[in-house]
Swiss-Prot record:
This is Pre-mRNA-splicing factor SPF27. Keywords: Coiled coil, mRNA processing, mRNA splicing, Nucleus, Spliceosome. It comes from the Eukaryota. Signal peptide: none annotated. Residues 139-223 form a coiled coil. InterPro entries: SPF27. It comes from Xenopus tropicalis (Western clawed frog). The lineage of its organism: Eukaryota, Metazoa, Chordata, Craniata, Vertebrata.
């Protein structure tokens, strides 16, 4: 918008994009790009503009697991497969068939897996009883969040539209005022030109009258 607003302390913002014409004319965009390129070449930074900042620590948020994984990737080692041993029920080895400790470990493993399956069954029962309602409540919360977000979005869009309308009306008003002032300026310049031409013409007439008066005076003196 035209006015006295300053950018960077010295630049007067006088663009009226809703009023000005000619931006789509051939060569205008290329000329603007050339001016920008010239400005960037003229003020290209001569040093690292981040030199005043401390050296970044990229490992600040790394965990032990992440570091081990990065080391594995850097050394090109294959990914360790997921162990399925906990889901198996192996019997004692042939050489340990008479070892009570080996059989006890197998029994403990079986009990742990049975307990795990029992917990899974309980979770499935809870899911069958309360899962539908919980899912409905979750969906209702999502719909409420979406509705609130949509309302906020509509408010923002309305604010943006109102602001654009205000800018457009202000710029069109300023543009009409500028056009009126330009027309007045052209009219005043034309009038000044007419006045100057009339003055020059009158000066010439006065000069001619003086010359005639002088000639008449000489003729009278001759008589």
């Amino acid at each position: 918008m035209a006015g006295t607003s300053l950018v960077a302390g010295d630049v007067v913002v006088d663009a009226l994009p809703y009023f000005d014409q000619g931006y789509d004319a051939q060569g205008v965009r290329e000329a603007a790009a050339a001016l920008v390129e010239e400005e960037t070449r003229r003020y290209r930074p001569t040093k690292n503009y981040l030199s005043y900042l401390p050296t970044p620590d990229y490992s600040a948020f790394e965990t032990e697991i992440m570091r081990n994984e990065f080391e594995r990737l850097s050394s090109r080692q294959p990914l360790e497969l997921l162990s399925m041993k906990r889901y198996e029920l192996p019997a004692p080895l042939s050489g340990q068939r008479n070892d009570i400790t080996a059989w006890q470990e197998c029994v403990n493993n079986s009990m742990a897996q049975l307990e795990h399956q029992a917990v899974r069954i309980e979770n499935l029962e809870l899911m069958s009883q309360h899962g539908c309602n919980a899912w409905k409540v979750y969906n209702e919360n999502l719909l409420h969040m979406i509705d609130c977000a949509q309302k906020d979005l509509q408010k923002l869009r309305k604010k943006i539209q109102d602001l654009n309308w205000q800018r457009k009306n202000s710029q069109l008003t300023a543009g009409a005022r500028l056009r009126e002032m330009e027309s007045t300026w052209v009219s005043l310049v034309s009038k000044n030109y007419e006045i100057e031409r009339a003055i020059v013409q009158m000066e010439n007439e006065v000069y001619q009258l003086k010359e005639r008066s002088g000639e008449n005076k000489e003729n009278i003196e001759d008589y």
